[in-house]
Swiss-Prot record:
<comment type="function">
    <text>An accessory protein needed during the final step in the assembly of 30S ribosomal subunit, possibly for assembly of the head region. Essential for efficient processing of 16S rRNA. May be needed both before and after RbfA during the maturation of 16S rRNA. It has affinity for free ribosomal 30S subunits but not for 70S ribosomes.</text>
</comment>
<dbReference type="GO" id="GO:0042274">
    <property type="term" value="P:ribosomal small subunit biogenesis"/>
</dbReference>
<dbReference type="GO" id="GO:0043022">
    <property type="term" value="F:ribosome binding"/>
</dbReference>
<dbReference type="InterPro" id="IPR056792">
    <property type="entry name" value="PRC_RimM"/>
</dbReference>
<dbReference type="Pfam" id="PF01782">
    <property type="entry name" value="RimM"/>
</dbReference>
<dbReference type="InterPro" id="IPR011033">
    <property type="entry name" value="PRC_barrel-like_sf"/>
</dbReference>
<protein>
    <recommendedName>
        <fullName>Ribosome maturation factor RimM</fullName>
    </recommendedName>
</protein>
<dbReference type="Pfam" id="PF24986">
    <property type="entry name" value="PRC_RimM"/>
</dbReference>
<dbReference type="GO" id="GO:0006364">
    <property type="term" value="P:rRNA processing"/>
</dbReference>
<keyword id="KW-0698">rRNA processing</keyword>
<feature type="domain" description="PRC barrel">
    <location>
        <begin position="104"/>
        <end position="177"/>
    </location>
</feature>
<keyword id="KW-0143">Chaperone</keyword>
<dbReference type="InterPro" id="IPR009000">
    <property type="entry name" value="Transl_B-barrel_sf"/>
</dbReference>
<dbReference type="InterPro" id="IPR036976">
    <property type="entry name" value="RimM_N_sf"/>
</dbReference>
<comment type="subunit">
    <text>Binds ribosomal protein uS19.</text>
</comment>
<comment type="similarity">
    <text>Belongs to the RimM family.</text>
</comment>
<keyword id="KW-0690">Ribosome biogenesis</keyword>
Length: 180
């Protein structure tokens, strides 16, 4: 599953929820009628008789809220209590349904996660475990030996090469970046 958003808190009493967007194509992914898969294991109730998050949610409406969040209504989610049960659920699409980017310098998160990170001299630094989307630039989260994570700005000056076929990302970090 390619994660396109994370459901946040309910908004109002009619079942709308806030969604933290994790896609470059929110207008497509959250269009009315779009079917989104929920994270594996999301349908485990907190207690017997509690609302079970379905394996799929269908978007009824979506609109921007405060410029950074989407307010989304899903079919069948009609009140605040059910909306509250969705809080924290990741929603996504099947990777098979995602078209490859046409720009050779554009990548989907799932293409980068798991790649080895090496210096231009060939020294292995670790592995990419996730991508954080910050306002200024995306950040590669590099897992170093010893389970220590380092954030690397995904900009050409620091990441001159992405070799998907070779399973690696070449970095040229400025002094001290890997020590943070």
């Amino acid at each position: 599953m390619l994660v396109v958003g994370r459901i946040g808190k309910p908004h109002g009493i009619r079942g709308e929820v806030t969604v933290e967007v994790r896609t470059d194509e929110p207008e497509t992914r959250f269009a009315p009628g779009s079917v989104l898969r929920t994270e594996p294991g999301a349908n485990v109730p907190a207690s017997p008789g509690a609302y079970r998050v379905p394996s799929e949610l269908t978007v009824e409406t979506a609109r921007w809220h405060q410029g950074r969040l989407l307010l989304v209504a899903f079919e069948g989610v009609l009140d605040r209590n059910v909306a509250e049960a969705l809080r924290g659920t990741f929603v996504g699409v099947d990777r098979a349904d995602v078209t490859a980017p046409t720009d050779p310098e554009e990548f989907h998160d799932h293409q980068l996660v798991g790649l080895a990170v090496v210096t231009s001299a060939g020294e292995r630094l670790g592995e990419i475990v996730r991508i954080d989307h910050a306002p200024a630039a995306d950040l590669l989260v590099l897992r170093r030996p010893g389970d220590r994570d380092v954030l690397i700005p995904f900009v050409r000056a620091i990441v001159p090469e992405v070799d998907l076929a070779g399973g690696r990302v070449v970095v040229d970090p400025p002094g001290g970046l890997l020590d943070l």
